[in-house]
Amino acid sequence: MKIQNLLIIAIGILLISCREQKNESINIFICGDSTAQSYDTSKTVMRGWAQMLPDFFDEHVTIINKAKAGRSTKSYLAEKRWKEVMDSIQADDYVIIQFGHNDASSKPERHASYADYKQNLIKMIKEAKAKQARPILATSIVMRTFKDNALIDDRLKAYPAITRQLADSLNIPLIDTWLQSRDLVVMLGDEPSKALYMWIEAGIDSIRPNGSQDDTHLQSKGAVTIAEMVATDIKKQNLKDIATHVIIP
């Protein structure tokens, strides 16, 4: 009887320990550019989608936003921003990797050829896995470019396609924010979709006092919309340890 009682106690302690481990916070690191980064809400109405992502998770998931404006896979690696993430990341943490906007740039410090872009992503994926972390690839959000009431988006070129193909070939989770944001902008149309992006009148934003007609960066409405897309996709794909903590209003 004593052995049975001890066994029951041991099992109970093990179950409690497992519950406590499951309740530990899982980190999601975000590596990307200005469309994801966090902004000072006292200075600008511009928002990054990752800035809004915490609103879609409960207290067991922590969002660590390391996205930075103007960065491509090339400059993010060169400036050792990726190394900083790898130095902090723990086993079972996630890292969402979303680049492309600045890789397509003609600026030499940013531009990455298609081959280099692919190799840079592979490097990031391998290094994350080496830390027993969980990489997720995300395509860039669509650049809201209309002509004759039709959406045309050729500025991102083949970078979203490369991201998509790489995720498939390496069996890495993909969040196709390019496709989802494109479909949304098409459904909304030219004028209504401006409310998602930094189309603002003069006097609204202290950083852009003369107003803005920006088809790349997001206002709060757009950032919340993209963040919800990301969280919904995480839940739909049932990603381990974080899917059950998604909150969709």
Residue ranges and their predicted role:
Residues 1-24:
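Bacterial Sec-dependent N-terminal signal peptides
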Residues 18-68, 82-91:
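Serine-esterase "nucleophile elbow" of acetyl-processing enzymes
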Residues 23, 80-224, 228-248:
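Alpha-helical cap/lid subdomain in secreted, periplasmic
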Residues 34, 72, 102:
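Gly/Ser/Thr-rich beta-alpha loop segments that engage phosphate groups in nucleotides
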Residues 38, 73-74, 105, 146:
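Glycine/Thr-rich phosphate-binding loops of Rossmann-like dinucleotide-binding domains
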Residues 68-73, 249:
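Acidic helix-start/capping segments at beta-turn-to-alpha-helix junctions
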Residues 72-80:
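Structural motif
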